UniProtKB/Swiss-Prot annotation:
Organism for this UniProt entry: Oryza sativa subsp. japonica
Entry keyword set: Fatty acid biosynthesis, Fatty acid metabolism, Flavoprotein, FMN, Lipid biosynthesis, Lipid metabolism, NADP, Oxidoreductase, Oxylipin biosynthesis
Name of the protein this chain belongs to: Putative 12-oxophytodienoate reductase 11
Enzyme active site: 183
PANTHER family reported for this sequence: NADH OXIDOREDUCTASE-RELATED (PTHR22893), NADPH DEHYDROGENASE 2-RELATED (PTHR22893:SF91)
Coiled coil residues, start to end: none
Enzyme class: oxidoreductase
UniProt GO BP: fatty acid biosynthetic process; oxylipin biosynthetic process
The EC number(s) this enzyme carries: 1.3.1.-
One GO molecular-function entry: oxidoreductase activity
Gene: OPR11
Record-listed substrate binding positions: 178-181, 270
């Protein structure tokens, strides 16, 4: 396959010159012991770095209430910021562009992850039913959340702002606000979760208010040219569905245009559940057409799908998760049409610093 395949063409994303359009999607790996990024992440991200390639770091907690999983990284303490620096430096040493995904899980948590064993915070006090974890084995139980009071919300918005500033201090090129997959921002966006009667609930405009206040705070802090957001209007992860996902996606796309943010990263409608593709009549096209910045599509893409999505103008960039996890040299494999390593789901979330993490083979150097 020649390097003129659409996925392998250069792209100018704001001030960043990308050499290709294959993006490392944000992937939770649960190897940041005690919520602190570890030295083994240097190799993991470096392996997946190409000169001019865009990488989005795994979901990273913004505060001590943001956690809901074992050993996920944070960026709210000095220790965490310092621990990220060599990881970011490793990506930059190979010419990569690195964004930090800033995250609050909201009610997708339980009190064992919370300071002083308190209830997780959310838009609502409706609790989640126990759910099988993404590894298909463990069952997660969730504590009944505490509905945030109206006057508390600005403090949470500020946590995102501080996390964004910390990410820039750690050397990241920008941040991606995690507004997808049933986590805190999504708990405000989706009408199946948000049952508030204040200015953050009810109408579409009110449900989007929290997300847009976060965007405002983060862009004010670090500049719109360093800010992206990830959204999944069509998804129903963690019981977070919406009765009119198209309207939600379009409203957000148009509202985001006013801030001039760098990119919008959307999850395909076919990805209703983690790792499972469904046929769907829905499309991201109207949302993509409405949004004026760079558009990134994600969710179950292979090489052929990705090339078609770029060539037809359906998206600018394509984010790959599981394929990039198991193929550290994915852009090169796409370029020469090499076979792909199969991923092993059983090692996605184990604590081992090597197995299932940095031990996926590269192509032989003589290929």
């Amino acid at each position: 396959m020649s390097s003129t395949a659409p996925l392998l063409t250069p792209y100018k994303m704001g001030r960043f010159d990308l050499s290709h359009r294959v993006v490392l999607a944000p992937l939770t790996r649960q190897r940041s012991y005690g919520n602190v990024p570890q030295p083994h992440a240097i190799l993991y991200y470096q392996q997946r770095t190409t000169k001019g390639g865009l990488l989005i770091a795994e979901a990273t907690g913004i505060s001590d209430t943001a956690q809901g999983y074992k050993d996920t990284p944070g960026i709210w303490t000095k220790e965490q910021v310092e621990a990220w620096k060599p990881i970011v430096d490793g990506v930059h040493a190979k010419g990569g562009i690195f964004f930090c995904q800033i995250w609050h899980v909201g009610r997708v948590s339980n009190n064992t992850f919370q300071p002083n064993g308190q209830a997780p915070i959310s838009s609502t006090n409706k609790s989640l039913k126990p759910a099988v974890r993404a590894n298909g084995i463990d069952v997660a139980t969730f504590s009944t959340p505490r509905r945030l009071e109206t006057d508390e919300i600005p403090f949470v918005v500020n946590d995102y702002r501080v996390a964004a500033r910390n990410a820039i201090e750690a050397g990241f090129d920008g941040v991606e606000i995690h507004g997808a997959h049933g986590y805190l921002i999504d708990q405000f966006l989706k009408d199946q979760v948000n049952d508030r009667s204040d200015k953050y609930g009810g109408s579409l405009e009110n449900r989007c208010r929290f997300a847009l206040e976060v965007v405002q705070a983060v862009t004010d802090e670090i500049g719109a040219d360093k800010v992206g957001i990830r959204l999944s209007p069509f998804a129903s992860y963690s019981e977070a569905a919406d009765s009119n996902p198209e309207a939600l996606g379009l409203y957000m796309a148009n509202a985001l245009n006013k801030f001039g943010i760098l990119y919008c990263h959307m999850v395909e409608p076919r990805m209703v559940k983690l790792g499972e593709k469904f046929e769907t009549p829905h499309s991201l096209r109207p949302i993509r057409d409405a949004f004026k910045g760079t558009f990134i599509a994600a969710g179950g893409y292979n090489k052929e799908d990705g090339n078609k999505a770029v060539s037809t103008g359906y998206t600018d960039l394509v984010a790959y998760g599981r394929l990039f996890l198991s193929n550290p040299d994915l852009p090169e494999r796409f370029e020469i049409d090499a076979p792909l390593n199969k991923y092993n789901r059983e090692t996605f979330y184990i604590s081992d610093p090597v197995i299932g993490y940095t031990d996926y083979p590269f192509l032989p150097s003589d290929v």
